[in-house]
Curated annotation (Swiss-Prot):
Domain Glutaredoxin: 90-193
Segments in the Cytoplasmic topological domain: 75-377
Lipid bilayer topology: Single-pass membrane protein
UniProt name for this protein: Prostaglandin E synthase 2
Length: 377
């Protein structure tokens, strides 16, 4: 396979955990899920998509149901253990972040990797970055899971690998709030094999938008059930809808596609030959693929309009009475939406988004909050 094809295959669809889906247009918002349903709902495909008559995802739904049982088992085990935790955390537990040595394997221009960096920076978690070559991917040869982001967390003698951006974020947030061992926390987000609409086996993760907290901890973080539900809903929206608007917009025209791949090559880890081939042949390939994505996701003729509508819908959800969805500080949904949009910075799509929607004040507030909290890493 020539370098350009390998780069395109790495960056679309799977190398960045960017699994573009065939079939109907994803719903911009998902119905409220009960806690018991998150093993199979928040971690897997929507019930509507799974139930579509004749869909190959019926097999995936069955697999997720089996995996969901495992998730419920771990959730029940967590609940029993949570009852034994002390209500007050010791001073040592307040400095949990200092115990972790984190290494993030990423593509800098991947929206899912950007989400994780936004979370780590806002929570002042120092980490090392390993930029993965999208052609050879030798940097992650240690892992059977071949998508990025991958986060390796070293805690004393224990080393844990966390996969999937939303699992990474939920697991680390649970760790910071509850003080539970990270080794135990990651068992609450079981990996499950499923078959997507293209008939390809994929890995889904149960409970990935759920923080494993007891009632007191949840009250401390959210203040109420509505805030928790809202955060989870919009985190999933960022993954299931917003992220799928990026490629059709940044590769919308040949000129934009070339500018996007110029940025990818400059920011990524490419050899001289790989970079030159990727810039021109990759741009041409992704320009054509963007047209398929436009049709696949049932976007408007002018795909900018879908991006604008998504941004304004998000701004409306945040509302005028609070600076962030999280209130006075960004929550996980704020960080997810910001992380996805940030990968377009410097491109025409980003400039148009800032000019033609009301999202810029919120975006700059999140950027400032992250900058003020971020440590050197």
């Amino acid at each position: 396979m020539d370098p350009a094809a390998r780069v395109v295959r790495a960056l679309w669809p799977g190398g960045c955990a960017l699994a573009w889906r065939l079939g109907g247009r994803p719903q911009p918002l998902l119905p409220t899920q009960s806690r018991a349903g998150f093993a199979g709902a928040a971690g897997g495909p929507s019930p509507v998509a799974a139930a579509r008559k004749g869909s190959p995802r019926l097999l995936g739904a069955a697999a997720l149901a089996l995996g969901g049982a495992l998730g419920l088992y771990h959730t029940a085990r967590w609940h029993l253990r949570a009852q034994d935790l002390h209500a007050e955390r010791s001073a040592a537990q307040l400095s949990l972040s200092s115990r972790l040595q984190l290494t993030l394997y990423q593509y800098k221009t991947c929206p899912f990797c950007s989400k994780v960096r936004a979370f780590l920076d806002f929570h002042a978690l120092p980490y090392q970055v390993v930029e993965v070559n999208p052609v050879r991917r030798a940097e992650i040869k240690f892992s059977s899971y071949r998508k990025v982001p991958i986060l390796v967390a070293q805690e004393g003698e224990s080393s844990q690998q966390l996969n999937d951006s939303s699992v990474i974020i939920s697991a680390l947030k649970t760790y910071l709030v509850s003080g539970q061992p990270l080794e135990e926390i990651i068992t609450y987000y079981p990996a499950m094999k499923a078959v997507n609409e293209q008939g390809k086996e994929v890995t889904e993760f149960g409970n990935k938008y759920w923080l494993m907290l007891n009632e007191k901890e949840a009250q401390q973080v959210y203040g109420g059930k509505e805030a928790r539900t809202e955060e989870m809903k919009w985190r999933q929206w960022a993954d299931d809808w917003l992220v799928h608007l990026i490629s059709p917009n940044v590769y919308r025209t040949p000129t934009e596609a070339l500018a996007s791949f110029d940025y990818i090559v400059r920011e990524g880890k490419f050899g001289a030959v790989e970079g030159a081939v990727a810039k021109y042949m990759g741009a041409a390939a992704m320009y054509l693929i963007s047209k398929r994505l436009k049709s696949r996701h049932r976007l408007q003729d002018n795909v900018r309009e879908d991006l604008y509508e998504a941004a304004d819908k998000w701004v409306a959800a945040v509302g005028k009475d609070r600076p962030f969805m999280g209130g006075q500080k960004p929550n996980l949904a704020d960080l997810a939406v910001y992380g996805v949009l940030r990968v377009m910075e410097g491109l025409d799509a980003f400039d148009d988004l800032m000019q033609h929607t009301h999202i810029q004040p919120w975006y700059l507030r999140v950027e400032r909050a992250i900058t003020e909290a971020s440590p050197a890493h």
